[in-house]
Amino acid sequence: MTQRIYLFNPDNDLALAHGGGHYIAPPFAQKMQNDLCALPMWYAEPGSLVLVSDEAMREWVDSTSERLGFTIKGITPDSLAKANDASFCPWGWSGTIKKRLIKRGVKAHLLPSDAAMEQVRLLSHRRNSIAMHHFIQERTSLPLSPVPVEYDDFNEVLDFATKHPGSYIKMPWSGSGQGVYHAIEPGTIEFERWCKGALKRQESLLCEVGLDRILDFALEFKCENGKAELLGYSVFESDFHSQYNSGIVGSKQHLYDIIASKFPPLHDITPTVTESVSHIYAANYEGFLGVDMLLYNDGGTTKLNPCVEVNLRATMGVVTCMVGEHILPKGSVGRFKIEYSKSGFHTSQENRIYLTPILPDTKYCAYIDLG
């Protein structure tokens, strides 16, 4: 029987932006990957393995799994070469993670082809989110946000940003708030350098009008056999630059109610978004996928941005979905957060559930504060 092996590679967006398979993660990303490597155990299928960095991590996964009645086990890199009949499930796919696994002794025939990796990269380009926006717009009468525009010339980008103060300029391959410039003052040298550098590396930029934010949320999917299955909803907070801060943890119904209380047509738009994911992505992609969305105020009317970005990978929203639905005590709610501390962490925090281990050299951890 084929066994699934999950692994956490949070630098995958950066690897896709780099292209090819020779990307080397910066030290902070490597440290985050090592400290949070146990995170997939919270959404992995029963009976699966989770790749962890060392024996201490493996022992934590095994003991936590046993305590909670899971059937998840940890596996260290030196055991990968023995995986003769395994299916690999990274946080996200790219040529980089494929080469890393082969370097660790994984047989190439167990991994997606190079052509499949290139297809994932092409699907991850933000212009596909424009196609998705149009797909949804053609199938609903709901008031939606303006569709982003793609430019390959700096003067066009500058003209857009000048006409729309507070707009967001985004690199085609980026995610989680990375590769995004909030153009408050587009006439600066800094803005010009950033845009021209991005155009040189990625050939185009996507420009979006800034919106009066009410609520950030996402629909979380799993794509399999050409179809998208809705796993649930995530509600999160992002900072001024659209980077993820924290997420609400609760049941699927609780999260639905939060969104629907501000936007009753959620029930009507969800099937349309699901259809768009199946149509644009699921035919050529298998795995987790998150569609970030936004409710915003436009002259007193609540409107929807149906596709802020699409993440072809697992997301923190997938984690909060699974934990809220299957792990948290019934009726409980909490807040999920990834935190960095140079001095380390204490495990005695009241009403806090740690989702990753606290070891002597831990600098990053994932946890839920209840209540």
PLM region spans:
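Peripheral (often C-terminal) accessory segments that flank ATP-dependent C-N-forming ligase machineries
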Residues: 328-371
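ATP-dependent carboxylate/phosphate-activation module, predominantly the ATP-grasp catalytic core
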Residues: 221-275, 311-337
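Conserved N-proximal alpha/beta basic substrate-recognition cap immediately N-terminal to
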Residues: 30-39, 43, 51-159
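Glycine-rich phosphate-binding loop of ATP-grasp-fold ATP-dependent ligases
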Residues: 147-148, 166-191, 217-218, 240-258
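ATP-grasp fold ATP-binding core
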Residues: 133, 161-182, 201-213, 291, ...
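Phosphate-binding site of ATP-dependent enzymes
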Residues: 165, 188-244, 295-307
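A long amphipathic alpha-helix within ATP-dependent nucleotide-binding catalytic cores
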Residues: 201, 243-303, 341-350, 354-359
